[in-house]
A protein has these predicted regions:
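Beta-strand-centric surfaces of beta-sandwich/beta-rich domains
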Residues: 18-380
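Cleavable N-terminal signal peptides of Sec/SRP-targeted secreted and luminal proteins
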Residues: 2-18
Length: 380
């Protein structure tokens, strides 16, 4: 009887500890919901800020999923029709206590500069699965990997555009320079004459054109993000995070110079689909166990191919069809994901892997994105 009472008390203490920490437990998987710092917006306003030392699970863990959405001060979801999420990223870094300098502890590649996030999406956030299947997990918090005297921390970069009252909401989302009345980039350097839209025109603090009679009302929004994880154990198979950018200019040089964005010209030949491709030599051997593409409006999908032309992973854009939150017409509200059967999507070390990104070319699109995020379990 005593041992039953002792077991009950242990379970009760465990439950109370989880409750006090804001944790939920489901089959050993821990879950916690966090809020980003406040993001203040006005109609047409752009916020593109980085937030350091955000809340994130502590300890040596395996992340199983990372989901989020934009909410207002009441905690209610915010529509893409009002606040467009151009992109968000979550990046790991190491920092010494009391020192501003930091070391970016990014993913496994492929770009030499940038694209170092562990997690990231855009408007497709709400309907894109991020769950890492068993027995795999994204390993973080390993004390043996943290430099002596440093602490592992995490940062958010959130690029949000308030399109309430916008003259051309889609044009604002594509960062058309004429709508932002911008001729210089954020570093006060003049834009090149042929640059008509993209990140250089919708940087933090810029404002897209709104209707003259529209009342400017301030709004505070937040990113509500939910992390699921398990404590690390030998039964978990670690996976590496890779991000393939279709603008990668690699040409057997070993240098992955990613341009980050590109334009899709309106077709003059009757071909309705624009295809952009890039090939790289893959640095390791392993199995693709999960993946999805990231694109902007106009995107159709993307696919990752092996050297022999086999499909390693493919992802299609999911468009909204109405006005409800999560179903906004004309917006990519989700991307399909791939979960290859174990062993069916193997990559050999130094194999040439090709990414193809597909966009509609019925009209012009500026500053588009062509990323493929995928997880690889390395071969032993």
């Amino acid at each position: 009887m005593d041992h039953i009472l002792l077991l009950f008390l242990m379970l009760l203490v465990s439950y109370v500890q989880c409750y006090e920490a804001g944790l939920n437990l489901e089959n050993g998987v821990k879950l916690k919901v966090y809020l980003s710092p406040k993001i203040t917006l006005f109609p047409g306003y752009v916020s593109n800020k980085s937030y350091y030392d955000i809340e994130f699970p502590k300890g040596h863990i395996a992340v199983k999923s990372f989901n989020d959405e934009v909410v207002d001060e009441a905690g209610d979801p915010v529509s893409l029709l009002e606040t467009y999420i151009h992109h968000w990223t979550v990046t790991r870094y190491y920092q010494r206590n009391g020192v501003k300098d930091l070391i970016i502890a990014g993913n496994s590649g492929l770009c030499n500069h940038g694209r170092s996030q562990f997690f990231g999406m855009g408007s497709e956030t709400r309907k894109t699965s991020t769950y890492v299947p068993d027995p795999y997990g994204i390993e973080v918090g390993d004390p043996s990997k943290v430099p002596v005297g440093y602490e592992e921390k995490w940062m958010f970069n959130i690029h949000a555009i308030d399109t309430r009252g916008a003259v051309d909401a889609m044009g604002c989302n594509e960062c058309r320079c004429n709508l932002y009345n911008v001729t210089q980039d954020k570093d006060v350097q003049p834009l090149k004459p042929y640059y008509v839209g993209g990140l250089y025109c919708c940087y933090d603090g810029t404002q897209c054109k709104v209707k003259n009679a529209f009342k400017s009302v301030k709004r505070n929004v937040y990113f509500k993000y939910t992390v699921k994880w398990v404590d690390w154990s030998d039964s978990i198979v670690p996976v590496k995070v890779f991000i393939f950018d279709v603008t990668d200019t690699w040409q057997h040089t070993g240098i992955h110079n990613c341009l980050f964005e590109y334009d899709v010209e309106k077709s003059t030949t009757g071909v309705a689909t624009n295809t952009r491709r890039s090939s790289v030599s893959f640095p390791t051997a392993g199995d693709v166990i999960y993946g999805f593409a990231q694109q902007y409006s106009g995107g159709i999908g993307a696919a990752l191919y092996g050297e022999d032309g086999r499909v390693l992973c493919a992802s299609k854009a999911i468009y909204g069809k109405g006005k409800d939150i999560g179903d906004e017409a004309g917006y990519i509200v989700g991307m399909t994901t791939c979960y290859p059967k174990p062993g069916s999507a193997k990559i050999v070390k130094d194999e040439t892997v090709t990414l193809e990104s597909y966009y509609s070319s019925k009209k012009m699109h500026t500053g588009v994105l062509g990323l493929f995020y995928f997880l690889v379990a390395e071969s032993s």
